[in-house]
From Swiss-Prot:
Keyword terms, alphabetized: Antibiotic resistance, ATP-binding, Cytoplasm, Fatty acid biosynthesis, Fatty acid metabolism, Lipid biosynthesis, Lipid metabolism, Nucleotide-binding, Transferase
Cystine pairings recorded for this chain: none
GO cellular component, one term: acetyl-CoA carboxylase complex
Substitution effect: residue 229 to T: Resistance to thailandamide
GO biological process per UniProt: fatty acid biosynthetic process; malonyl-CoA biosynthetic process; response to antibiotic
GO MF, one example: carboxyl- or carbamoyltransferase activity
Subunit text: Acetyl-CoA carboxylase is a heterohexamer composed of biotin carboxyl carrier protein (AccB), biotin carboxylase (AccC) and two subunits each of ACCase subunit alpha (AccA) and ACCase subunit beta (AccD).
The EC number(s) this enzyme carries: 2.1.3.15
Upper lineage: Bacteria, Pseudomonadati, Pseudomonadota, Gammaproteobacteria, Enterobacterales
PANTHER family: ACETYL-COENZYME A CARBOXYLASE CARBOXYL TRANSFERASE SUBUNIT ALPHA, ACETYL-COENZYME A CARBOXYLASE CARBOXYL TRANSFERASE SUBUNIT ALPHA, CHLOROPLASTIC
Protein name listed in UniProt: Acetyl-coenzyme A carboxylase carboxyl transferase subunit alpha
């Protein structure tokens, strides 16, 4: 799969284009006198060095672009790479099956767990079918149904957050979008099983929070978590979405800032260039963090789990 480079990655893109051209020439004529392999190796080293330099000094807006990268791994990619025997479950048993939320039972190193996550979709038809990862009320009600099932069978719950926000359409509001989100917040705080939440891309507002109340909250290195998108904030404060980069910096949407504010527990490092550069390595790091979190939570009693979760929620907003 050819990489899709963002605007700030254009110097890297130019180097990679040269590498591809030289590689293509080498394949066409293996009898060339010049040593193309040596030049390709030199350019690859230069590309890695340049990538490292650019990614060492990313701003919040650049991180937001990475969090939305079209090739970034989604929930089902991590399910495939980090879990076994996934059995998807569908429907909220009240209205419909919302494809923007996926969930089901899987095994993590042999242990049954309940997985719930946003799913955006890749191709145009799938994006539309999954509503670009923006759940309707039935999506959140499906998520809650699966959480309650996990509680009945004493299975840990693992959620993956990646949404621009809950769907704001008229139909969603008529079917009780705000009530569905509020109910999830309340019920997740009361669950008797461990809950681990990880932001893998965009963590957009209440749409993210509705599956984001947990005992452990993690973020991938180049993910974001905020009450509104940078464009939305800029449109309100400056009446122009063009001010989105300024808004992104002001809102503190990136993982280091959120960890500093004690809103998250861990930052999971991404491969050089972002998770989309090496999904397998990213999935391995994510899996290791989940196993570590489960080991920490397994030693706690049900009362301790719930008390810690409550204290965590009550601490939000205090310096």
């Amino acid at each position: 799969m050819s990489l899709n480079f963002l605007d700030f990655e254009q110097p890297i893109a130019e180097l990679e284009a040269k590498i591809d051209s030289l590689t293509a020439v080498s394949r066409q004529d293996e009898k060339l006198d010049i040593n193309i392999d040596e030049e390709v190796h030199r350019l690859r080293e230069k590309s890695v060095e340049l990538t490292r330099k650019i990614f060492a000094d990313l701003g919040a807006w650049q991180v937001a672009q990475l969090a939305r990268h079209p090739q970034r791994p989604y929930t089902l990619d991590y399910v495939r790479l980090a879990f076994d025997e996934f059995d998807e479950l569908a429907g909220d048993r009240a209205y419909a099956d919302d494809k923007a939320i996926v969930g089901g039972i899987a095994r993590l190193e042999g242990r049954p767990v309940m997985i719930i996550g946003h799913q955006k979709g890749r191709e145009t038809k799938e994006k539309i079918r999954r509503n670009f990862g923006m759940p309707a009320p039935e999506g959140y009600r499906k998520a809650l149904r699966l959480m309650e099932m996990a509680e009945r069978f004493n299975m840990p719950i693992i959620t993956f957050i990646d949404t621009p926000g809950a769907y704001p359409g008229v139909g969603a509001e008529e079917r009780g979008q705000s009530e569905a989100i509020a109910r999830n917040l309340r019920e997740m705080s009361r669950l008797n099983v461990p809950v681990i939440c990880t932001v893998i891309g965009e963590g957009g507002s209440g749409g993210a929070l509705a599956i984001g109340v947990g005992d452990k909250v993690n973020m991938l290195q180049y993910s974001t978590y905020s009450v509104i998108s940078p464009e939305g904030c800029a449109s309100i404060l400056w009446k122009s979405a063009d001010k989105a980069p300024l808004a992104a910096e002001a809102m503190g949407i990136i993982a280091p800032r959120l960890k500093e504010l004690k809103l998250i527990d861990s930052i999971i490092p991404e491969p050089l260039g972002g998770a989309h550069r090496n999904p397998e390595a990213m999935a391995a790091s994510l899996k290791a963090q989940l196993l570590e979190d489960l080991a920490d939570l397994d030693v706690l009693s049900t009362d301790d789990l719930k008390n810690r979760r409550y204290q965590r929620l009550m601490s939000y907003g205090y310096a």
